[in-house]
Amino acid sequence: MFTPRLSPTVSGYAMPSIWPVVPIIAGDATIPAVGVRLAGEPLTELILSRIVAEINDNPILDGITISGGDPFYNPFALLALLRRLKEETHKNVWCYTGYTYESLLKDETRRPCLDYIDTLVDGPFVQSLFDPALSFRGSSNQRILHLSKYR
């Protein structure tokens, strides 16, 4: 899943922050979205239900990756999305963010999201540290943190 919103200070990402933040419906509450879209459409409760069903109906899928933009741009919507995906699919969740793990731990609004992420790839993409030989990350300052190993 791609979340298109970026912090204004982030540069060098392949996808610019061009889409507006729109609401998604999560459970009984309307929550400001992270800007998640499916084929350019806002992620609604109906679409998310279909995505969950497709994930659960596909035996070859073993995980979900959330990237962007930055998924942590709107932590309240991210938490609702992660909770729903994790609880209803029980899949391994990877998440890419420009924030560092340490800064997320210190942030009371973003920290709860970490409970639903199995693997976090943290740190901003830095063009001067780009290395095409790296697995699962774009620049050498980014770390792959297997959070589920410590729960």
Where in the sequence are the language-model features?
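Glycine-centered flexibility motif
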Residues: 10-12, 21, 63, 90, ...
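Short secondary-structure boundary micro-motifs
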Residues: 1-4, 48, 118-119, 128-129
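Hydrophobic pocket-lining residues within nucleotide cofactor-binding pockets
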Residues: 22, 71, 125
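Conserved Radical SAM active-site core
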Residues: 4-5, 12, 32-113
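N-terminal pre-triad scaffold of radical SAM enzymes
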Residues: 1-32
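Auxiliary Fe-S-binding modules of radical SAM enzymes
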Residues: 56-59, 89, 98-151
